[in-house]
Amino acid sequence: PRYLMGVGKPEDLVEAIFNGVDMFDCVLPTRNARNGLLFTQFGDLKIRNTRYSSDKRPVDKSCKCPVCNEGDNSDQPYYSRAYLHHLQKINEMLGSILTTSHNLWFYLDLLKQIREAIKAGTLKKWRKNFYDKRSIGV
């Protein structure tokens, strides 16, 4: 296995895997989450930004994590950007827990998508689509 230490941005992982790296470790998803930076398929979202203070949408409506997706239980709706913004601004521990959960889910899903693209022989096409989406912005 080829190991790359301390690299953690989604784009860095995609490029490293594209170039043959097999293993990573990095604190970036959790550290960024604690500081209010969330990863989405359309780019990074800085939840502390005032524009999210009344935004009722989930972080990423296509994300299936427990933070973004209400799932089958309508009594447990997703956590809105406004609520996450509020938690981060008042330094409530739940804010860091929820944002960390989302970012880790994002990374696990990203790596799952890459594994599937490798198995299907479509990694190059998947990589282009990944960059196209990330450049849209949130």
Regions from the PLM with identified roles:
Residues 1-4, 9-138:
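Alpha/beta catalytic cores of nucleotide-metabolism and tRNA/nucleoside-modifying enzymes
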